[in-house]
């Protein structure tokens, strides 16, 4: 055995390392990697196909081509291992060394590395403080640069042309100064830089400069210089200081003993200029013979050949002392060749190969989806896997899948071989192999045994969330298709129309264990996105269950009574009773103590059959199933069963439900027939009414009472309303069972939630309604026919618009949604649960989500499964309901809701103070398990998947009314939802001429209070709304269903507050106002036009003032004069000099909805929010509380001043003149209120209102988009992503830290610096100041590129830029996140991997403690193996 060991060498264990460092390689280091210099551009000999000596594939340099055999064949076999053949110079060893041995090319003239020159910001340019343009002129031999000005009047780094140089040499003499050209010049410039001095001057300038731009530039430069210098060490030994080669500085100390600072890890700037080019191993750029004598080669060989050719030519020219101009040209060509090798196409023309295809350079090998990172390191292919079509397996249990025998035999081969040997059926592996290939009968028995309880993993692409891969126990089946359990289809998003799935076999015991414990389908009952069950029956099963729980009057056997379920089955079999008859029966259950009892229930035989499979538990009452079950109800039942009876019962229950559903759906014999779609008789009448109303609006338009836009809006409204009416009439007809026919089957399918929806039936049997144009506007003429009647040619043509758009959208959507998921995963991948409790007292306040007065999401749903941060006290009795630090479960939610609490303070990931991760308390419940979240759970990835997975269901764009076509009319009134007392908040009312109160304020709200005085609803009322007369007095009581307020949704009115005589000011005909004569009607109206475009209109401020009889301007209640400014497009409603009453309309501004401005909706809106972009029409928000005043306008902007009376502080805002301003002079605005229409900018919200408001805004906006599609996502997922977006802070005051003002650093780094200051204060230093910083919001792309791990960032986007920056800074990657560990091939630090990680950490800390105890402090230096170099 020892002999063998000696021959083969000890087996090498996998190299283990803790970090990876990347830095710029010095020429010496490149030479030290190399096994020889490559001198010739030849690759292989065309006759012998052996590599040429000293060429790109040279065997002497890179190693032998065949294992243990030199090139000339003198030495063969193992026994000559390690000998170098004296004839051909090749070492006898394994041929795989050709994958790791590198070579090099010695350049005749230095060249600049394109990454450091061109990757913006140019590193060389920053260091030398020169522009990229100047650098290129030096580099490509256009200008000389002064390197050493001597005593002349030239400046350092000054550029000179050839002629200028000669002039200066004549003037000062040739030796008076030094000027050079090309990369040598640049090398000298970099070598002469004294980084330590530069650093000092930069810091000085920073203190003195006032200009922001200059400061930014200096900070950038300073950071770069510090990155080059690296960390410093202090030495006191003079001799060591003298010996040290690199950067060093003396520090004078008051006690006269100098202290020396050396920078041992400093990177020399001149290394950015290459003297030696490394050549990568030949097996990584192979040359492969194809049949037919041709060769396929990697593009790199071409690029290297170019470099070698030009380099050799340059050497020859220099030896021949050729004229300067020729040598220069050759040097320039060499520079271009090296540029192309590193990054083809970055500078100048792209170098193309023989087939006009650009050559792939080293940078291209790393970049993009096909690059090294994403193709090979993050996306490896897997052995022991197969794929096949799936078919439905309704007789399987939930934890099983059907695996074709042929596939199983192939997948489990190694296990079968082992077993065959174990039982002595085969003497060797070879014999076993033969048996398996012949498919002998005993092989099948062994296969059965091997497969027993060995889970396999099934995956369906696209794997959008973690439920796309689940483990099942295989059962062997005949045939070639995989059988899948119907209930897991929702999770896989699978159907059986030809979908394929992949099977993977977990090999090791640990893998099998994880598959069984964590990934088994029975463990994934709840969805990780919302915590609702995902194993929910759908389609046929729902239909079957709906059918057996129906109760119909007048069926056979109605009113009978039964004692047991057996009797019912008997009666059903003998047709004595119908499934749907109303009967009485005994039901055995358990009472609250858990004792068995019998209750008498009124129900149907079908429901009794269902009750048989219901688990018996005190919390599961018979009422749960004693009703008509729709898909939603069934989901609720499964949820209740899971919460009370646990997982095992739920799985058994779900399986039984499925069996029951399928068998009854088939017995029901429900079919889909043309006559099931009934067209309502009222349809004709409704359509005729609508057409009459449309004619009336046309007439009003012709008479000039309404504008074109208003007519359009009204017509669209009428038609949407009519479509709804026809649809509801149709539903009424379909709902009623027809005598002798039973219930309408199409209605049953839709109502149960099995297939189809009311909207689809509406198109089949109602009317199709309005269609959208491609631009998103709605076509005024609706489609009156339905599909049953058939469309006319014109109608069909109109409907193709919308349909085609839908198809185009779907194609775009999938790609966009996938990209959003990728960005989310990348930003959140390192959010992992790393500790149990971070001990923070902070949190956020949760309220119910209320929209338009209705509670959309109740408080209970939002706080379920979160941790309370402040004790919850009952508002009336004062008893403690939930203590701080407890988790809110279903029980607590009930208690809180009963107490009528409307807001709860909870812990949140946003305020979690854990470093490098999140704590379990702040996260709360793991939604997929229903218990507190486990340590090591990768909550970031789960959040990203939960948000990204429904992305494909979101639309690409919702049209303002493309949505409204379905949404019915715009909201134009508020009705009371309950009997209540109404309080008017922020009252600002005026009685108009009819005595109706009109709202004059922008933030008027109606609060509805119940008997106890608790607020139950709150409605925002727009400016200009007419209120119910009863509301003139505060505290009026109103009845449910009363109209509280109404308004015109299509125009914004400008109202008067006093009576008086209207007087036009600056409304000049032809400049700021024009008569618009409607061609169709001949009626004219006055419209305010854009007066700023006119030369005469620059100083105008069109307005209407109110005067009294004497001609004085009327004063308003707040003491200001009554002036009303007009905005562009306002239509004047009063004539000059007309008398007006308070509350009358002076002008109307049409709302933009005729040409709907696309509200960015759907996916793009979600992406816009996560990327923290400025919305297209963003609104300006107020920074302070105060009153609004209008200042003097600028040319294109209006000035709004907000002044706070208490503090006297004021802020002014400039708003473009065309935009509609939503506040009026004298209005009181609060901090964070919008001053104009549009969406606010997230960064502004953060700056003005803080983190919690920002988070609330983002959560609500994102949830709105998902809610519209009916997708439930838990808030905490969005919080996790927002936390990742807020990782950085910007230093506003550096205090006494080493940070710089204005730089952005990680929050942890900032806290660390302040901790150091605190430490110094504890040690007794006086008057130190902490650094102060403000949070910075970054979009998800930017945040993922700024992670601490450069490997993770490089594998995401902009690979070259990330690597350049990392190399310059000499970054160290500590391999903390998931991605980095996948890339270097280790266990990820999440899930079970986090436990291993933790153990390693503990061991390392223990070793350190032991070392300290021994008094030895060995901090091992970085292993050379861990260093990469650019």
Curated annotation (Swiss-Prot):
Ligand binding (Zn(2+) 2): 838, 912, 919, 922
Entries under SUPFAM superfamilies matching the protein: beta and beta-prime subunits of DNA dependent RNA-polymerase (SSF64484)
Binding residues annotated for Zn(2+) 1, in chain numbering: 70, 72, 85, 88
One Gene Ontology cellular component annotation held by this UniProt entry: DNA-directed RNA polymerase complex
UniProt cross-references to InterPro entries, sorted A to Z: DNA-dir_RpoC_beta_prime, DNA-dir_RpoC_beta_prime_bact, RNA_pol_asu, RNA_pol_N, RNA_pol_Rpb1_1, RNA_pol_Rpb1_3, RNA_pol_Rpb1_3_sf, RNA_pol_Rpb1_4
UniProt KW Lyase keyword: no
Enzyme Commission code: 2.7.7.6
Family annotation (CDD domains): RNAP_beta'_C, RNAP_beta'_N
Swiss-Prot/TrEMBL catalytic activity: RNA(n) + a ribonucleoside 5'-triphosphate = RNA(n+1) + diphosphate
Binding site for Mg(2+): 495, 497, 499
Co-factor note (free text): Binds 1 Mg(2+) ion per subunit.
SMART domains xref list: RPOLA_N
Keywords: DNA-directed RNA polymerase, Magnesium, Metal-binding, Nucleotidyltransferase, Transcription, Transferase, Zinc
Pfam families per UniProt: RNA_pol_Rpb1_1, RNA_pol_Rpb1_2, RNA_pol_Rpb1_3, RNA_pol_Rpb1_4, RNA_pol_Rpb1_5
Protein role: DNA-dependent RNA polymerase catalyzes the transcription of DNA into RNA using the four ribonucleoside triphosphates as substrates.
Family stated for the protein in its record: Belongs to the RNA polymerase beta' chain family.
PANTHER family associated with the record: DNA-DIRECTED RNA POLYMERASE, DNA-DIRECTED RNA POLYMERASE SUBUNIT BETA
Subunit structure and binding partners: The RNAP catalytic core consists of 2 alpha, 1 beta, 1 beta' and 1 omega subunit. When a sigma factor is associated with the core the holoenzyme is formed, which can initiate transcription.
Protein name stated in the entry: DNA-directed RNA polymerase subunit beta'
Species of the source: Rhodospirillum centenum (strain ATCC 51521 / SW)
């Amino acid at each position: 055995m020892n002999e063998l060991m000696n021959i083969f060498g000890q087996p090498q264990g996998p190299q283990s390392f803790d970090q990876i460092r990347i830095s710029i390689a010095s020429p010496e280091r490149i030479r030290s990697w190399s096994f020889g210099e490559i001198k010739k551009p030849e690759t292989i000999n065309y006759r012998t196909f052996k590599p040429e000596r000293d060429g790109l594939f040279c065997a002497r340099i890179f190693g032998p081509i065949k294992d243990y055999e030199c090139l000339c064949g003198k030495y063969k076999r193992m026994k000559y291992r390690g000998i170098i053949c004296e004839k051909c110079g090749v070492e006898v060893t394994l041929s795989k060394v050709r994958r790791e041995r590198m070579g090099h090319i010695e350049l005749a003239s230095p060249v600049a590395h394109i990454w450091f020159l061109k990757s913006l910001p140019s590193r060389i340019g920053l260091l030398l403080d020169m522009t990229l343009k100047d650098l290129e002129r030096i580099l490509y031999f256009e200008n000389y640069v002064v390197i050493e000005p001597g005593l002349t009047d030239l400046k350092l780094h000054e550029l000179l042309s050839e002629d200028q140089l000669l002039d200066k040499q004549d003037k000062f003499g040739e030796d008076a100064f030094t000027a050079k050209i090309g990369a040598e010049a640049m090398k000298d410039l970099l070598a002469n830089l004294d980084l330590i001095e530069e650093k000092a001057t930069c810091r000085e300038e920073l203190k003195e400069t006032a200009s922001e731009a200059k400061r930014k530039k200096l900070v950038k430069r300073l950071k770069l210089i510090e990155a080059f210098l690296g960390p410093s060490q202090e030495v006191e030994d003079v001799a060591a200081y003298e010996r040290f080669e690199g950067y060093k500085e003396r520090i004078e100390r008051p006690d006269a003993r100098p202290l020396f600072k050396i920078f041992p890890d400093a990177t020399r700037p001149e290394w950015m200029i290459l003297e030696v080019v490394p050549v990568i191993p030949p097996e990584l750029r192979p040359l492969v013979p194809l049949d037919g004598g041709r060769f396929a080669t990697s593009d790199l060989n071409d690029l290297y050949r170019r470099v070698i050719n030009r380099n050799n030519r340059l050497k020859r020219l220099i030896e021949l002392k050729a004229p300067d101009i020729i040598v220069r040209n050759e040097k320039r060509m060499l520079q271009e060749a090296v540029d192309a090798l590193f990054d083809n196409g970055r500078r100048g023309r792209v170098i193309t190969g023989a087939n006009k295809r650009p050559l792939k350079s080293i940078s291209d090998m790393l970049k993009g989806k096909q690059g090294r990172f994403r193709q090979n390191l993050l996306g490896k292919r897997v052995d022991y896997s197969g794929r096949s079509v799936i078919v439905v397996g309704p007789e399987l249990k939930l934890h099983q899948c059907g695996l074709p025998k042929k596939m199983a035999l192939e997948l489990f081969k190694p296990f079968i071989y082992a077993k065959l040997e174990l039982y002595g059926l085969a003497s060797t592996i070879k014999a076993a192999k033969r048996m398996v290939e012949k498919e002998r009968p005993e092989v099948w028995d062994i296969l059965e045994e091997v497969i027993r309880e060995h889970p396999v993993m099934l995956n369906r692409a696209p794997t959008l969330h973690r439920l796309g891969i689940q483990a099942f126990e295989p059962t062997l089946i005949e045939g070639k298709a995989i059988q899948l359990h119907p209930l897991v289809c929702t999770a896989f998003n699978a159907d059986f129309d030809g979908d394929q799935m992949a099977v993977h076999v977990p090999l090791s015991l640990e893998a099998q264990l994880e598959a069984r414990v964590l990934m088994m389908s029975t463990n994934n009952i709840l969805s990780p996105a919302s915590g609702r069950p995902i194993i929910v029956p759908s389609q046929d099963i729902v239909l079957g269950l709906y059918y057996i729980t129906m109760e119909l009057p007048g069926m056979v056997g109605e009113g009978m009574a039964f004692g047991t379920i057996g009797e019912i089955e008997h009666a059903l079999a003998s047709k004595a009773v119908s499934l749907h008859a109303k009967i009485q029966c005994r039901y055995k259950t358990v009472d609250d103590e858990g004792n068995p009892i019998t209750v008498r229930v009124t129900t149907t035989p079908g429901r009794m059959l269902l009750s048989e499979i219901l688990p018996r538990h005190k919390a599961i009452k018979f009422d749960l199933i004693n009703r008509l079950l729709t898909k939603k109800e069934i989901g609720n039942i499964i949820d209740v069963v899971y919460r009370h009876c646990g997982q095992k019962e739920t799985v058994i229950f779900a399986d039984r439900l499925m069996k029951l559903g399928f068998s009854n759906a088939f017995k029901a014999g429900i079919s889909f027939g043309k006559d099931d779609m009934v067209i309502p008789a009222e349809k004709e009448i409704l359509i005729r009414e609508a057409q009459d109303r449309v004619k009336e609006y046309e007439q009003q338009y012709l008479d000039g009472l309404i504008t074109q836009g208003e007519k359009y809006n009204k017509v669209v409204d009428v038609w949407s309303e009519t479509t709804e009416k026809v649809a509801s009439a149709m539903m009424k007809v379909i709902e009623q069972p027809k005598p002798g026919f039973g219930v309408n089957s199409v209605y049953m399918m839709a109502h149960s939630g099995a297939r189809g929806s009311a909207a689809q039936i509406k198109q089949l049997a109602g009317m199709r309604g309005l269609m959208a144009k491609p631009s998103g506007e709605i076509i005024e003429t609706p489609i009156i026919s339905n599909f049953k009647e058939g469309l006319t040619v014109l109608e069909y043509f109109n409907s193709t618009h919308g349909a085609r758009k839908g198809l185009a959208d779907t194609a775009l959507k999938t790609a966009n949604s996938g990209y959003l998921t990728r960005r989310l995963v990348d930003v959140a991948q390192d959010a992992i649960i790393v500790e149990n409790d971070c001990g923070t007292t902070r949190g956020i306040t949760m309220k119910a989500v209320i929209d338009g007065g209705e509670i959309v999401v109740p408080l209970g749903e939002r706080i379920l499964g979160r941790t309370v941060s402040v004790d919850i006290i009952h508002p009336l009795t004062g008893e403690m309901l939930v203590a701080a630090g407890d988790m809110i479960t279903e029980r607590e939610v009930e208690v809180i809701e009963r107490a009528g609490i409307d807001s709860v303070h909870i812990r949140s990931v946003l305020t979690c103070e854990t470093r490098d991760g999140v704590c379990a308390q702040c996260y709360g419940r793991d939604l997929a398990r229903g218990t507190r979240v486990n340590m090591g759970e990768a909550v970031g990835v789960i959040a990203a998947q939960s948000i990204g997975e429904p992305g494909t269901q979101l639309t690409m764009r919702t049209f303002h009314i493309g949505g409204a076509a379905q949404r019915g009319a715009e909201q134009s009134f508020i009705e009371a939802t309950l009997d209540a007392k109404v309080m008017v908040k922020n009252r600002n009312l005026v009685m108009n001429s009819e005595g109706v109160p009109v709202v004059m304020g922008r933030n008027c709200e109606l609060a509805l209070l119940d008997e106890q005085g608790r607020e139950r609803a709150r409605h925002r009322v727009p400016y200009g709304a007419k209120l119910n007369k009863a509301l003139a007095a505060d505290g009026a009581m109103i009845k449910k269903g009363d109209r509280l307020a109404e308004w015109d949704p299509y125009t914004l009115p400008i109202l008067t507050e006093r009576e008086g005589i209207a007087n036009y000011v600056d409304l000049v005909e032809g400049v700021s106002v024009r008569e618009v004569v409607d061609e169709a009607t001949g009626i004219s109206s006055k419209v305010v036009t854009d007066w700023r475009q006119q030369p005469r209109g620059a100083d105008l401020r069109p307005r209407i003032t109110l005067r009294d009889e004497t001609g004085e301007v009327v004063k308003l209640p707040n003491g200001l004069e009554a002036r009303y400014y007009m905005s562009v497009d306002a239509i004047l409603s009063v004539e000059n000099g007309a008398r007006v009453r308070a509350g009358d309309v002076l002008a109307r501004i049409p709302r933009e909805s005729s040409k709907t401005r696309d509200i960015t909706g759907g996916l793009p809106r979600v992406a816009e929010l996560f990327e923290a972009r400025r919305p297209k029409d963003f609104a300006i928000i107020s920074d302070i509380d105060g009153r609004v005043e209008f200042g003097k306008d600028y040319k294109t902007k209006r000035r709004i001043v907000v002044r706070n009376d208490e503090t006297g502080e004021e802020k002014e805002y400039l708003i473009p003149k065309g935009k509609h301003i939503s506040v009026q002079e004298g209005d009181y605005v609060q901090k964070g209120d919008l001053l104009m229409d549009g969406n606010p900018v997230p960064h502004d919200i953060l700056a003005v209102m803080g983190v919690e408001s920002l988070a609330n805004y983002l959560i609500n906006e994102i949830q709105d988009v998902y809610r519209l599609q009916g997708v439930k996502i838990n808030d905490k997922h969005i919080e996790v992503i927002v936390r990742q977006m807020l990782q950085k802070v910007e230093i506003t005051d550096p205090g006494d830290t080493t940070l710089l003002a204005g730089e952005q650093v990680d929050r942890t780094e900032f806290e660390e610096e302040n901790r150091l200051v605190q430490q110094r204060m504890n040690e007794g230093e006086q008057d130190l100041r902490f650094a102060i910083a403000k949070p910075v919001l970054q979009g998800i792309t930017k945040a993922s590129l700024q992670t601490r791990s450069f490997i993770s960032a490089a594998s995401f986007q902009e690979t070259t830029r990330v690597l350049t920056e990392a190399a310059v800074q000499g970054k160290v990657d500590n391999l903390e996140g998931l991605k980095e560990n996948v890339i270097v091939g280790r266990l990820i630090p999440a899930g079970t991997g986090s436990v291993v990680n933790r153990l390693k950490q503990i061991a390392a800390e223990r070793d350190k403690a032991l070392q300290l105890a021994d008094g030895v402090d060995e901090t091992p230096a970085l292993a050379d193996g861990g260093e990469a170099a650019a």
